[in-house]
From Swiss-Prot:
<comment type="function">
    <text>Neurotoxin T2 is a presynaptic neurotoxin of the venom that exhibits indirect hemolytic activity against human erythrocytes. The B chain is homologous to venom basic protease inhibitors but has no protease inhibitor activity and is non-toxic.</text>
</comment>
<keyword id="KW-0800">Toxin</keyword>
<keyword id="KW-0964">Secreted</keyword>
<comment type="similarity">
    <text>Belongs to the venom Kunitz-type family.</text>
</comment>
<keyword id="KW-0528">Neurotoxin</keyword>
<comment type="subunit">
    <text>Heterodimer; disulfide-linked. The A chains have phospholipase A2 activity and the B chains show homology with the basic protease inhibitors.</text>
</comment>
<keyword id="KW-0638">Presynaptic neurotoxin</keyword>
<dbReference type="GO" id="GO:0090729">
    <property type="term" value="F:toxin activity"/>
</dbReference>
<feature type="domain" description="BPTI/Kunitz inhibitor">
    <location>
        <begin position="1"/>
        <end position="15"/>
    </location>
</feature>
<keyword id="KW-1015">Disulfide bond</keyword>
<dbReference type="GO" id="GO:0005576">
    <property type="term" value="C:extracellular region"/>
</dbReference>
<protein>
    <recommendedName>
        <fullName>Kunitz-type serine protease inhibitor homolog T2 B chain</fullName>
    </recommendedName>
</protein>
């Protein structure tokens, strides 16, 4: 849903 700090944290809740 949100991809603001997609590179800072692993893709678990950002995707």
């Amino acid at each position: 849903r949100q991809r603001h700090r997609d590179c800072d944290k692993p893709p678990d809740k950002t995707n």
